[in-house]
Amino acid sequence: MAGLEAIKYGRGRLEVLDQLRLPHEFVYDNVSTCEEAFDSIKSMRVRGAPAIAIVAALALAVELHHEKDGSKTKQEAVQYINKRLDYLLGSRPTAVDLSNAIKLLKRVSQSAAEATNALDDSAACADVRKGYIDAAEKILEDDLTTNLAIGRYGAEYLRRQQMPIGGEEDDEDPSKFFTTSPPCTQGAPDRTYRKLSVLTHCNTGSLATSGHGTALGIIRSLHKMNYLDHAYCTETRPYNQGSRLTAFELVYEKIPSTLITDSMAGALFARMKESKNISAVIVGADRVARNGDTANKIGTYSLAVLAKAHNIKFIVAAPTTSIDLETVSGADIKIEDRAPTELTQISGAVVGKDGHVDVNTTARVAIAHQGIDVWNPSFDVTPSMYIDAVITEKGEVVRSSKGTFDFKTIMPERWAQQVEGKELSAETNVKAHVDDGTQFPMENI
């Protein structure tokens, strides 16, 4: 998506878009240390599970590129990397992408130290740094590829829900059978099918990833493939990622869209499901447990219950890095609580009497009594019984008739290693399998 990037990176330099200033200002912060990355993540200037992991990984890569570790031996270099990664983990404990990236990068660094043939300590340290930097940059590169695949699989999954298996299913261009013109009955003699409308929550697009997005990536793909009628997005209180960021991305891409408050979803489904063919709620995930329970932005659980009540598909879009096979269920997921002021106060650009938005003047105002007690969890956990499918870069995993999700089908090696406790096969050991399915040669691991 040209012109809209949350992360700008070149070896030795990292810039992160300050998303708290959107949609009115484009300001990139230079991030040259792990402390600056930690602050960007904690303050939510950067957010979204994939983007958080990428920024954390690349911030340390920038430090290492400039040799800020000051290591004298390869062992010191590994110790420095591990210490800095442990520090970064505390910036957003709920996001499994961050913990997965940290585990990978620790393995990479240790393996680089063991594999180096350098004859002096300085060169050995350089090999460890290079091993880390290469792996961190690969995380950035792979994320975009992953998101494009999620978008494609998700769009095709939803298309199949609209178009029964039949002659046109095998047509080279199924989009020509989709229309927004009612009345239009599936399977009608003219072989036309309703374009679908969807609802999304929070922000899961280019601003939350390296590009394209996960849940919003599916919406982008639906639009590009001519299957989409309309996209609805929630404001996503209390941080308003939907109104500030998702609405901004949808308008930027000229995708037909409407913003609603979080509490309007039930009314939207009741009044407009049939007329707009609202077919799915699509959300992202900060962590998916082994049984399919999903931690995501607060308000996701409510939407899932409403979707089930209205017989609307509830779809989770997430890379396999967000699937945590070591966490058995949502009961084991740590939920982050945030500051009470996020509910009781709000900031924004000042609107003049003429309706003009003055981006150079911001104000913070109180919207609740400052003495009220506040409970402000950043995430909730949606039980797997409310989720119809999890869309990943390897395809969809659909809830079975028994109410279970079989992630083993898309991650057999990880399942064997982390769930069954089996050793990877000799063939798999030739290439080490990282959490997102990307394979690195063993010498780089």
Curated annotation (Swiss-Prot):
Reaction(s) this enzyme catalyzes, per UniProt: 5-(methylsulfanyl)-alpha-D-ribose 1-phosphate = 5-(methylsulfanyl)-D-ribulose 1-phosphate
UniProt-recorded name of the protein: Methylthioribose-1-phosphate isomerase
Broad class of the protein's primary localization: cytoplasm
Family, similarity comment: Belongs to the eIF-2B alpha/beta/delta subunits family. MtnA subfamily.
Site residues (Transition state stabilizer), renumbered to this chain: C202
Location(s) in or outside the cell: Cytoplasm; Nucleus
Pathway: Amino-acid biosynthesis; L-methionine biosynthesis via salvage pathway; L-methionine from S-methyl-5-thio-alpha-D-ribose 1-phosphate: step 1/6
The protein's Enzyme Commission number: 5.3.1.23
HAMAP family: Salvage_MtnA (MF_01678)
Pfam families: IF-2B
Function per UniProt: Catalyzes the interconversion of methylthioribose-1-phosphate (MTR-1-P) into methylthioribulose-1-phosphate (MTRu-1-P).
InterPro entries membership: IF-2B-related, IF-M1Pi, IF_2B-like_C, Initiation_fac_2B_a/b/d, M1Pi_N, NagB/RpiA_transferase-like
GO MF assignments: S-methyl-5-thioribose-1-phosphate isomerase activity
Catalytic residues as annotated in Swiss-Prot or TrEMBL: D286
Cellular component aspect of the GO annotation: cytoplasm; nucleus
Entry keyword set: Amino-acid biosynthesis, Cytoplasm, Isomerase, Methionine biosynthesis, Nucleus
Gene name per UniProt: mri1
Example GO biological process: L-methionine salvage from methylthioadenosine
